[in-house]
């Protein structure tokens, strides 16, 4: 998650008397909450009590007198760095103190009272699931409510997550972000004030070996099946005509497990696909389509001659990556403390081991750069869990004073319709992709992005290349 405080506001108190400075905290470029300095100071003091002063980053000190515009700007920058440092710390960023502070602030900022509401959550194929939740329910609460509605066992809930998406005209989803523990899903989706934004349930792991755990259960099997059919229909999974025929035959026989077994062998099975964007690979300003999955980032690009090619970047060969944000300066080329900002430009850059002893930066410019970074981190986390012999099965916390809330009524996951015939353009694209070798990974210069613009994510799953790989 990318935390920023891009602007401040001068606001009046509840009584309409004295004014105060409000700091607008954004997550992934969208307003999350509006807080005062005193509220952030209270958070800092609470974290210091729980974890000690040595663990915490520096916090801007109190001032006896009113701040000048320049001092407000300086404090904004210091608070932004503080919030980013706390969030990136594994201990502090996952603490209930930090997350509950952000949830309360989000609810107060949007002025949403705590009450029971009906929240619509979509499955990957568009099926609607209505759950009764509180407006103050956090992400895990809503996920549990959806699981209860579908009768998904508790020990399989950890295999799924809720995602905030924007529904496009063709029915496909453009992923905004995975909903986090510091936000309230109802408030997050309604505060955007657009019917395009939805909450979607989707599997949250990358390694298809975990499918076996989910497929043991009827509901889990149906969820995977519905997601896979949807991904094929939208062209996320690459399918030839013959493979499409085999899949449709298995559908007609209602052989869901066999359908999934075949789908697992297909290119881009289980991948998340992003909107078209721009990369500096294999040349500057190259239009690409990025997909994430199977411990890699895939870049599909069309070269001169209309040939579609694919470059695959393994996460184990990424030494580190960073997300940078920049805002064009207003006309005149100077920044002012007024905090008036234009559209944010986001870039994901990763340092890749192209060959033995040769690292090279690759940069992707996309509004979804932060989501791509989150995918990289979750793939690394999953690799580390598997390497240590751990499991992603999630034993849910029990609430104080009782068991998990269960739904009064349950809803079955409907089987999606049979696959439609693939269009000709998609078929030709698959043929080219399967026959041509990967694009050259040589001759690309390092980007001019300023590394100080954001934190660099080190990769604990980074591996060297042996002679046998060359």
UniProtKB/Swiss-Prot annotation:
Q: Where is the PX domain?
A: 1-109
> What are the GO MF terms of this UniProt record?
low-density lipoprotein particle receptor binding; phosphatidylinositol binding
* Keywords, comma-separated and alphabetical: Cytoplasm, Cytoplasmic vesicle, Endosome, Lipid-binding, Membrane, Phosphoprotein, Protein transport, Transport
Q: Where does the Ras-associating domain lie? A: 115-206
Know anything about its domains from the record?
Answer: The PX domain mediates specific binding to phosphatidylinositol 3-phosphate (PtdIns(P3)). Required for association with endosomes. The PTB-like F3 module within the FERM-like domain mediates cargo recognition via their NPxY sequences, while the F1 module (Ras-associating) is responsible for interaction with membrane-bound HRAS.
Summary of subunit composition and partner proteins: Monomer. Interacts with APP (via cytoplasmic YXNPXY motif). Interacts with KIF1B. Interacts with the C-termini of P-selectin, PTC, LDLR, VLDLR, LRP1 and LRP8. Interacts with KRIT1 (via N-terminus). Interacts with HRAS. Interacts with ITGB1 and ITGB5 (via NPxY motif). Interacts with CCDC22 and CCDC93; the interaction associates SNX17 with the CCC complex. Interacts (via C-terminus) with VPS26C and VPS35L; the interactions are direct and associate SNX17 with the retriever complex.
The protein's name is Sorting nexin-17
